[in-house]
Regions:
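Non-catalytic nucleic-acid substrate-recognition regions in nucleic-acid-modifying enzymes
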Residues: 2-136, 376
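Short beta-strand/turn micro-motifs composed of small residues
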Residues: 10, 258, 338
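Flexible, glycine-/basic-rich loop-and-beta segments that form/coincide
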Residues: 53-55, 158-163, 167, 373-376
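A short, flexible beta-alpha/helix-coil linker loop
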Residues: 100-103, 159, 304-308
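C-terminal edge-of-domain segments
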Residues: 140-156, 367
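SAM-dependent Rossmann-like transferase core, predominantly class I methyltransferases
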Residues: 151-185
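Conserved S-adenosyl-L-methionine
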Residues: 174-291, 307-308, 312-314
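C-terminal catalytic and target-recognition region of SAM-dependent MTase-like enzymes
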Residues: 287-289, 293-376
Length: 376
């Protein structure tokens, strides 16, 4: 097979960014939908998306798309799918997925039906009555929504947010894909001073450094499809070499600070693993008291929400103190994500713009202060 259809699930609110990334990578037929981005391409496009995407969650190869309201229709739809094109005779093919607003709502039953249909199809195509499943893992995923069944092959393995640089996070880490999106939404290109005053495990500064250097986030991790029989190993080598050639080597001003010394130590270790330690400075500091690190720049942060790390009232007091401290920081653009619906009130001024994003399952707003207006 030389041409495929792919689906890239995204955190809600990031679909447009992921679509733009795919287009910049030269990938064809990109279509943006709610919660995902679709594209067409060959194994090289698949590898490029896995290695280079910053805001997508994983890369799924679309195997089938059909309607089913009964288990028999589900079985027949899977049985008609050319699974032998992507799963070899000894391949291991576990099944997982989800159901929503459909006649078929039992995930375990749907898993069993899909597994049975896939086994029958592959057994007949390979002329065997029993499949050993001792070889490479080919993870099948299904989505049943409004009686529409979509069957996928996961080409990523661990989610794309797992860059490989964060072995251990702090108590409430920010997802790497969301951090990258937050940086992208500031239009940062490596020329401004970037400061995260609540850096935690360093995710925002690290993602900013990866963007500044144009360093592919998946350069040093492995992907499930690297072991697929129908993907030439040279594809991955070529994609990584091309990404390496496009990296920039400049001097960048990126600072991460936190009032917890343990977070600073963790951030330094993570930056080293990400290969960007030379681009970032980390230091202890109270965000509401420390001096501004430069006359102008971009502040990007994920302060405590009052849901996991602090009580809500304490978080609100923190927002007010931060607003007072930054009141005269006219040279700084400020980008702050929080689930607090009254953030602007506590911070002391209205945002120039705000955008709805999700941090895990938490619905948030990304407040963007891009002018020098000080009033509420």
């Amino acid at each position: 097979m030389s041409n495929f259809e792919f689906s890239v699930p995204c955190l809600f609110g990031l679909e447009g960014l992921a679509g733009d990334e795919l287009r910049r990578l030269g990938i064809e037929n990109v279509r943006v939908e709610n919660g995902r981005v679709l594209f067409s391409g060959d194994a090289r496009a698949m590898a490029k998306a896995n290695v280079c995407l910053r805001t997508g969650e994983r890369v799924l190869l679309t195997l089938a798309d059909f309607k089913a309201t009964t288990f028999e229709e589900l079985f027949q739809g899977v049985y008609r799918t050319n699974l032998e094109d992507v799963i070899p005779k000894d391949g291991t093919f576990p099944v997982k997925g989800h159901c929503l607003n459909s006649q078929l709502m039992s995930v375990p039953d749907c898993q069993a039906i899909i597994k049975k249909a896939a086994s029958k199809r592959l057994g007949e195509k390979y002329g065997v009555s029993w499949l050993p499943e001792t070889g490479t893992k080919y993870q099948l995923q299904f989505s049943i929504m409004n009686d529409r069944v979509q069957l996928f092959l996961d080409t990523s393995g661990p989610g794309l947010h797992k860059r490989g640089y964060r072995a251990v996070g702090n108590e409430a880490p920010l997802r790497e894909t969301l951090a990258a999106a937050m940086v992208q939404l500031t239009k940062y290109r490596g020329r401004d001073f970037v400061w995260d005053p609540f850096c935690g495990s360093g995710t925002i500064p690290i993602e900013a450094a990866l963007i500044a250097k144009n360093k592919a986030p998946g350069m040093y991790r492995r992907f499930a499809s690297e072991a697929f029989a129908w993907v030439e190993p040279s594809v991955w080598g070529d994609v990584r070499a091309e990404a390496k050639d496009k990296e920039f080597n400049g001097k960048y001003q990126i600072l991460g600070s936190d009032n917890d010394p343990k977070c600073i130590s963790l951030s330094i270790a993570n930056a080293r693993k990400a290969g960007v330690a030379d681009c970032i400075s980390f230091r202890d500091g109270d965000a509401t008291k420390m001096d501004l690190p430069a006359q102008s720049g971009i502040l990007i942060c994920n302060p405590p929400y009052g849901q996991r790390m602090m009580e809500q009232r304490s978080a609100q007091q923190l927002y007010a103190a931060l607003g007072r401290h930054l009141k005269f920081a006219d040279g700084w653009k400020k980008y702050i994500i929080t689930s607090e619906p009254e953030f602007e009130h506590y911070f002391g001024r209205r945002a120039t713009k705000k955008r709805k994003l999700y941090n895990g399952m938490i619905k948030c707003d990304y407040y963007m202060y891009t002018d020098n207006q000080r009033k509420k």
